[in-house]
Amino acid sequence: MTQSTTSHYYVESPSSRALVVGAIGVVFGDIGTSPLYSLKECFSPEHGIPFSPDAVLGIISMLFWAFVIVVSLKYVMFVMRADNNGEGGILALMALALRTAAPRSRMAKLIMMFGIFGACMFYGDAVITPAISVLSAVEGLEIAAPGLSHFVIPITLLILALLFFIQRSGTHVVGKLFGPIMVVWFLALGALGLIHLVQAPGIVKAINPVYAVSFLHDHSLQAFIVLGSVFLVLTGAEALYADMGHFGAKPIRTAWFVLVMPCLILNYFGQGAMLLGNPDAIENPFYLMVPSALQLPMVLLATAATVIASQAVISGAFSLTSQAIQLGFMPRMRIRYTSAAEIGQIYMPVINWILLVLVICVVLAFKKSDNLAAAYGIAVTTTMVITTFLAALVMRNVWKWNPALVTLISLTFLVVDMSFFAANLLKIAEGGWFPLLMGGSAFFLLMTWHSGRKLLRARSLEDGIPLEPFIAGLLAHPPHRVEGTAVFLTGNTESVPVSLLHNLKHNRVLHERVVFLQFVTRDIPYVDDDERLSCKDLGGGVYILKSEYGFKETPDVQRVLDLAQRKLGMQFELMETSFFIARESVIPSKLPGMSMWRESLFAWMHQNGAKPSDFFSIPANRVVELGTKVEI
C-alpha cells in the first residue's frame, strides 16, 4: 500500500513469489511456532489423560481436523472473502457489518461493541505471544545444554528487551530476512516430522475423524479440557485474515496450502509417531525429535522464528492502535513511520513500552511456557467467535447469500468455535484471567473515550453558532483583514470553531484567506487521492476544506495542503500560513452523561493525548493554540 493511492503493501508491486515468501514471514509466525509447546501441553498431567496409543491418535486427529475446519475452511475459504477494499481484520469486518445496520440503531451499536471487544482481546494476545513463544524456544536449552537451564529466564528477558528496544529504529532492514528464515523453519518442521513419520507410519490413521470422536467419547470431561490445549495449534490463525491487506488473499492461501499447512501437519504427526514409540518423550516432544547434534542449532532457529512471530504481533498492536485512533476509540498518540517504503512500518512509543513492561511481568510471573499455555487461547477464541458472528451478517446482508446456507455455515463454525471457547474458559483460574483482564481493560478505556468524545461533540453543538450564517454576517461587516492564510482545524463544519471566536475576540482581525479544515474517517481502509478532498467556497476568501481518510491512514496537514494545491489549485505558502487549534480542557460535571469517575478518566485521557499539532504533522512554529473549557 503506497502512501498515496493504493492499498498494496509495497511501493513497487512485488512478484507473486515475493508476496508468498513475505506472507510466510509475517502472517504465519504465531501459528508456525505452536509446535514448540502445543502437543506437550495436550498431555499435561493436570488434564488427567492417561497416556496410551489411542490417546495419541485421538489428539493428533483433533489437531488435524482443527486445521482443516478452522483454518482451511473457515478462514481461508470463507472469512477471507470478506475484504473491506482489500483489507482484513476484525475492525475491517466490523466496518463491513455496520453497513448492514441502520446508523445509531441498537444493532449498529451491538456490532460496534462486538467488533471493538474482539479487537481489544488482541492486546492480551500481544502480551502473551512474545512471552510464550520466546520462552518455549529458549527452554530448548534444557534439552540441548542442561547446564544452561538456569539461564532460560534471563536469556528470554534479554531477547525480549532487545526486540522492543529496536522497534524505534524499525525492522525494515532485518525484516527482509523474516520470510526466508520462516521458510527454513517450516521446511525444518516438515523434515523432522517426516523422519519420525516414516519410522511409525501408523500415526497416519489419525486422519480418520473417528479417532477424534472416540477420544472425546471415551474421556468426556478430560477430553473437553484437552480441547483448550488442542486450540493452541490454532493461535495465530486470525492473522491470515488480519494481514490480508498487506499481501493479498491469494499469496496467503498459496503459502498456507503449499508450505505452511503441510509442514505443520507433518511435524505434529511426527511428534505423535515419536510418542507412540517413546512415551517418555512427552517431556518435550518437539526438541526430543531433533537429533542430539542438531538440538542447539534448532534452539537458535526456533528462537529466531519466535522473535519473528513476536515482531508480527507487536506490529499488529501498533497497527490496531492506529486504526482505533482514526475510528475515534482512542486519544491521539505519537506515530512514527520507520520506513519510507512501507506505510505499515510504524512505531508507537507509548504502546511499545507498555507492552515491554507487561511482557516482562508475565515472564517473571509464569516462569515456564507450560504455565503460560493456560493463559493462552482465551483471547483468540473470543475473537474467533465474534468473527463468526460478524461474518454471518456480511454473508447474509452484504453478499445476499441464501439464509439457510448462511445458517448452516455459521452454526457449523460456531459449534467448533464455542467448543474451543468453553474449553478455554476452564483455564481462567490458571492464567486465562490475564488476557481477559487485558482485553476487558482495553475495551473499557476505548468505550470511555468513545462515549466521552460523543459527549464533547454534543456539548459543542449545543453551544455552537451555525457557521455559514456567521461567516455571511462577518463578511457583511468585516473586521480588519491581515495578509496570509489562517487554517482552523475543526471536527464539525456546521458550527463556528471556538478557535476562530477566540481569535476574533482577542486579536480582532481576520486573515485575507480563511480555511476551515476537517478530517473525516471513512469506513474503508484507504481513500484514493482523487476522492480525498472536497472544497466549498463561502465567498470573501473563506473556504471549507474536507479531507477524507481511511481507518488505516494517518492524517497529515502538509500533505493535504500539497494535494489541495495539485487538485484544487489552492496555493499555500507554509511560512505565510497560521494554523489555529482549540485546546479543550474537559471539566467533569453532574450534567447527564457518564458517571463522574468515568468523566474524570476521560478528562485525564484527553489531557494526556498527543497534541493535534504533533499528530497532524503541523510545523510547531506555525501553530496558534487557543484554550477553552468544556463541561461534560
Curated annotation (Swiss-Prot):
A GO MF term: potassium ion transmembrane transporter activity
The keyword Transcription regulation appears for this protein: no
Signal sequence coordinates: none
Topology versus the membrane: Multi-pass membrane protein
Compartment annotation: Cell inner membrane
Pfam families tied to this protein: K_trans (PF02705), K_trans_C (PF22776)
Main location: membrane
Transmembrane segments: 19-39, 59-79, 110-130, 146-166, 178-198, 221-241, 256-276, 298-318, 346-366, 375-395, 403-423, 428-448
Family: Belongs to the HAK/KUP transporter (TC 2.A.72) family.
Name of this chain's protein: Probable potassium transport system protein Kup
Species in which this protein is naturally found: Cupriavidus metallidurans (strain ATCC 43123 / DSM 2839 / NBRC 102507 / CH34) (Ralstonia metallidurans)
